[in-house]
Regions:
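Non-heme Fe(II)-dependent double-stranded beta-helix
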Residues: 1-114, 119-122
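Short, conserved beta-strand element in jelly-roll/cupin
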Residues: 122-134
Length: 134
């Protein structure tokens, strides 16, 4: 177990499939903010922007950019994300499927319906997780 999370967080994840870990990536906020800003200005081939009917803020989605955006790569390989994921899943190792960035600007009226991510993954495994970093 990593010092960043406690046994209760692991138990919550194991029981409920989700848990909240506050502040575990605080040292990475600036790195990730710069990476996301770059990504928004320079979307990859799968990047998409959506604007609602009222023309408010945009909603942007993009993924699989960690090989071209150094901040994403730095976070993936140098943060405690893998250690945290392994602890939550009680796994000896983790493997990255992909990173996925969602940016919802203020005043956007594009809705995001409640959904489950698992059907979107072409992965069969007993232990998988998504780390959401707001």
């Amino acid at each position: 177990m990593t010092a960043l999370i406690d046994a209760q967080a692991i138990a919550d994840f194991q029981t409920n499939g989700a848990t909240v870990l506050r502040g575990v990536f605080a040292d990475w906020v600036d790195v990730l903010r710069e990476a996301v800003d770059f990504n928004v200005a320079n979307p990859g081939p799968d990047g998409r922007f959506y604007t609602g009917e009222n023309g408010g803020g945009r909603f942007m989605t993009d993924y699989c950019n960690w090989t071209r955006i150094p901040g994403y790569r730095d976070f993936i390989f140098n943060s405690n994300a893998a250690e945290i994921g392994a602890a939550l899943m009680d796994a000896g190792r983790v493997q990255l499927f992909h990173e996925h960035v969602l940016v919802k600007e203020a005043a956007t009226d594009v809705t995001t319906p409640w959904h489950q991510d698992a059907p979107y993954y072409s992965v069969q495994a007993e232990k998988t997780l998504s780390l959401w970093i707001p």
